[in-house]
Swiss-Prot record:
This is S-adenosylmethionine sensor upstream of mTORC1. GO terms for biological process: cellular response to amino acid starvation; methylation; regulation of TORC1 signaling. Pfam families: Bmt2 (PF11968). It is an enzyme of class 2 (transferase). S-adenosyl-L-methionine-binding protein that acts as an inhibitor of mTORC1 signaling via interaction with the GATOR1 and KICSTOR complexes. Acts as a sensor of S-adenosyl-L-methionine to signal methionine sufficiency to mTORC1: in presence of methionine, binds S-adenosyl-L-methionine, leading to disrupt interaction with the GATOR1 and KICSTOR complexes and promote mTORC1 signaling. Upon methionine starvation, S-adenosyl-L-methionine levels are reduced, thereby promoting the association with GATOR1 and KICSTOR, leading to inhibit mTORC1 signaling. It comes from Xenopus tropicalis. Keywords: Methyltransferase, S-adenosyl-L-methionine, Transferase.
Amino acid sequence: MEPVLQARGKRENVLGNAREERCVPGFPSACEQKLEQEKLSGVVKRVHRDLRKKYREAGDFEKIWLEHCKDKGRLCEYAVAMKALADNHWAKKCEGEGRIEWCLGVCQEYFFNGGKKKAIEKDARRATLNKLQSPNHAEDGVSDFSVPNIKPLNDEYMTGKIRLLDVGSCYNPFLKYEDFLAVGIDIVPAVETVCKCDFLNLQIQRPLQFAPDAIDAFLKQLESPIDYLPAELFHVVVFSLLLSYFPSPYQRWICCKKAHELLTLNGLLLIITPDSSHQNRHAVMMKSWKIAIESLGFRRMTYSKFSHMHLMAFRKTSLKTTSDLITMNYPDMLYIPQDFNYDGEEDYFSPCCARSELEDEQLACGFTELPDTPYDSDSGESQNSTMPFYEFEDPILLLT
């Protein structure tokens, strides 16, 4: 037994010396970057974990959120860590296919390359078909939110800049693109170009009755902090790694509802949420999210799964929502795996999800993504699968 232990000890010493040699001159940057990334990721993970723990213990998400927003020191530490991760680690590993580039591509295709026109035309065909199938539908006075509001095709192409609101922006990555008039908001901004704003408690006012250039001027003069915004102000609202930050499904629901109010008709809600598992591991959860968000007056236009995240684009198809959304349990359908994890480590990069060592070190964000797999909600089929998706087979729906 002793020779075995001695041999094992020698082998471990050799491996240990090899690791040390990698940190000598010649390999310093890689070692330093890895250590820095571990430290920064730990800061972010602890904030998320502590929020969920407090919510499970107290159950009052409003009180917990207010206390969280008052912890300036920790919020500043979080903002600095997120910006450092984005600048020094995530951006270098995306190789041009990151979450920001995905948002840019979706917006360009939709607003400048005819995507919006095609979507509106499809709505018109769907409305005509529904009318033919239900001739007495309009006479009965029944409000059908599955039939989108049809708007004349006089604004299907964007003529000016895309007015974009980036919620939880941290460092306003969309500001560098000429296509966007970007407004970044965060509870604790990491840079001066981001306005301080608590989106959960943002007050929504009546829409502005201004010309487009006047609305652009209004956005350009916004100052921090932002406590209120007019409705129907933006063409795009982005939730990039935002919804999983909140410990309560109802908070995620509030965010999506506010996004619906802030978007113009046919505007886009882009949602990016972390997940390092394979594409089908949380397929039921993604279907549940789709149904819940569409109930607000959206229709999912695109879905993609990268190696570390889900990416979804929803189009606002109705100016109003139904009045009984809460009783239908839609808020609870915006769940994440961590909501049911009570065993301590509860983020997407925990060992129970069979992640690699490198993935365990990284926080819920995209690094080197796989090719995206667009999903057409209208057709019910994924481009990499011919199997249709029937919503009524979703176990979450059966439970609720």
